[in-house]
């Protein structure tokens, strides 16, 4: 789930499901489950638009944004350790 949160933190705008799927490389089922968990935890906001076909966008909630500095530290550490 850290990969989803980190990607969303680095993208200020709302992100559509398929964009996330392409960028992060998860299966649709896995991504759907993780987004649902993040939404239930209040870390990600989900907005459904009344359009055909249906459009759903995700973005970090205010609560999720507070994780930004922590995520940056974790991913910086991972880069240092793996280099």
What positions do the PLM features span?
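Amphipathic alpha-helical dimerization/coiled-coil segments
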Residues: 6, 11, 48, 69-83
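Basic, amphipathic "hinge/linker" alpha-helix immediately C-terminal to the N-terminal HTH DNA-binding motif
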Residues: 51-72
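Long, contiguous secondary-structure blocks with strong helical propensity
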Residues: 3-6, 31, 45, 56-61
């Amino acid at each position: 789930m850290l990969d989803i949160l980190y990607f969303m933190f680095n993208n200020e705008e709302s992100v559509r499901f398929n964009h996330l799927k392409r960028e992060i490389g998860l299966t649709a089922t896995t991504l759907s489950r993780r987004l649902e968990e993040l939404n239930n935890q209040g870390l990600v906001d989900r907005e459904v638009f009344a359009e055909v076909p249906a459009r759903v966008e995700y973005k970090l909630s205010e609560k999720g944004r507070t994780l930004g500095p922590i995520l940056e530290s974790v991913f910086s550490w991972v880069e240092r350790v793996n280099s």
